[in-house]
């Protein structure tokens, strides 16, 4: 992390540099005008992780600055949500005099929401005993006088929860209130307000759709739930078990009755669609009954593998969100043979870094 780059006064210049870089990267393609969605310049990250440094009686958060090649003390952290910044000094002052809770504590993770919940995970290089558990309960009770907080203690093969290991985020998306169960230690979009802009963009590009939607890599149902209003039915796949459980929770919480989640990888689903293999997890699901004209993909940094690209090319419309423009570029070399790029977008999920969250909407030629 380059802490020196985190200057709100230079934010607009840094965002424009990303816009220029992204447009240059895709010059070989016939792309429409680049849309871009900016971030807040401070307090935009809903989660943060800090290592802990012990120095005599002192105890403080730190991060490693790659530019300086050294650790940097972080009493406050500009990118983190206001709630995390409010919690940081209160928590560390309670930990400093507590020899049981601070002993062998090496990391603290925070997960917060725009709706005011915060989850704190304390990570240790020791086993957590009954004495630690008693002190953790007191800590949670003390923090609860100021915060809507839950607490987790983690050590090797241990996870102690006081009282929940998740938060519930509430987002206003295109005038509709959506709730999302976000579990500790699983993927969620880090920038809450930009995540809303991503959902609204996806709703907009698919607003006149017909038939059904297929989503690969659906996570906790973040996009599927928001997009269900635009389709007759939605079929979504996700491999990670905690994310699938969150997705099922979110379906019920948001009263979505036209969304089916399947726990399997995109690669296995591709084989199932091609009738190469049959899977027990698909028993009772008639894939042929779905009339999916649109496919939504938000793959890992590695992008889509060759077989999944071929699967995706079979759909009339493709919504592709990417956390790695280089792998999106590689995938578009094939996808552009069969589809036109009709929308092109940059979401600044990660201000003050080189990371770019981008997206395209493609329609069959």
UniProtKB/Swiss-Prot annotation:
The keyword tRNA processing applies. The keyword Cytoplasm does not apply. InterPro entries: MeTrfase_TrmA_AS, MeTrfase_TrmA_CS, SAM-dependent_MTases_sf, TrmA_MeTrfase, U5_MeTrfase_fam. GO terms for biological process: tRNA methylation. One of its GO terms (molecular function) is tRNA (uracil(54)-C5)-methyltransferase activity, S-adenosyl methionine-dependent. Its EC number is 2.1.1.-, 2.1.1.35. It is an enzyme of class 2 (transferase). This is tRNA/tmRNA (uracil-C(5))-methyltransferase. Belongs to the class I-like SAM-binding methyltransferase superfamily. RNA M5U methyltransferase family. TrmA subfamily. Dual-specificity methyltransferase that catalyzes the formation of 5-methyluridine at position 54 (m5U54) in all tRNAs, and that of position 341 (m5U341) in tmRNA (transfer-mRNA). One of its GO terms (cellular component) is cytosol. Keywords: Methyltransferase, S-adenosyl-L-methionine, Transferase, tRNA processing. Signal peptide: none annotated. The active site is at residues 323, 357. S-adenosyl-L-methionine binds at residues 189, 217, 222, 238, 298. It comes from the Bacteria.
């Amino acid at each position: 992390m380059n802490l020196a780059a985190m200057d709100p006064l230079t934010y607009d210049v840094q965002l424009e540099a990303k816009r220029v870089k992204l447009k240059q990267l895709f010059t070989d393609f016939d792309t429409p005008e680049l849309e871009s969605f900016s971030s807040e310049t401070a307090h935009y990250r809903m989660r943060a992780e800090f290592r802990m440094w012990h120095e005599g009686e002192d105890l403080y958060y730190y991060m490693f600055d790659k530019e300086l090649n050294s650790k940097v003390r972080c009493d406050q952290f500009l990118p983190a949500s206001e709630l995390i910044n409010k919690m940081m000094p209160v928590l560390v002052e309670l930990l400093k005099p507590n020899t049981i809770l601070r002993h062998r504590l090496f990391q603290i993770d925070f997960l917060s929401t725009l709706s005011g919940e915060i989850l704190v995970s304390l990570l240790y290089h020791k086993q957590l005993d009954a004495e630690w558990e008693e002190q953790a309960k007191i800590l949670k009770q003390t923090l609860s006088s100021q915060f809507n907080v839950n607490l987790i203690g983690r050590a090797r093969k241990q996870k102690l929860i006081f009282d929940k290991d998740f938060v519930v985020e509430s987002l206003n998306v295109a005038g509709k209130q959506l709730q999302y169960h976000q579990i500790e230690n699983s993927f969620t979009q880090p920038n809450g307000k930009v995540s809303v802009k991503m959902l609204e963009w996806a709703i907009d590009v698919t607003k006149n759709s017909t038939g059904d939607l297929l989503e690969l890599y659906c996570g906790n149902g973040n996009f599927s739930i928001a997009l269900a209003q635009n389709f007759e039915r939605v079929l979504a796949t996700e491999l990670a078990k905690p994310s699938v459980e969150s997705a099922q929770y979110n379906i019920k919480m948001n009263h979505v009755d036209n969304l089916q989640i399947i726990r399997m990888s995109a690669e296995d689903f591709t084989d199932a669609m091609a009738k190469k293999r049959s899977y027990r997890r698909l028993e009772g699901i008639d894939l042929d009954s779905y009339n999916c004209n649109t496919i939504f993909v938000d793959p890992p940094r590695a992008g889509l593998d060759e077989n999944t690209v071929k699967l995706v090319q079979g759909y009339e419309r493709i919504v592709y969100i990417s956390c790695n423009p280089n792998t999106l570029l590689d995938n578009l070399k094939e996808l552009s043979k069969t589809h036109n790029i009709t929308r092109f977008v940059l979401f600044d999920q990660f201000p003050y870094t080189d990371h770019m969250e981008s997206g395209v909407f493609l329609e069959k030629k």
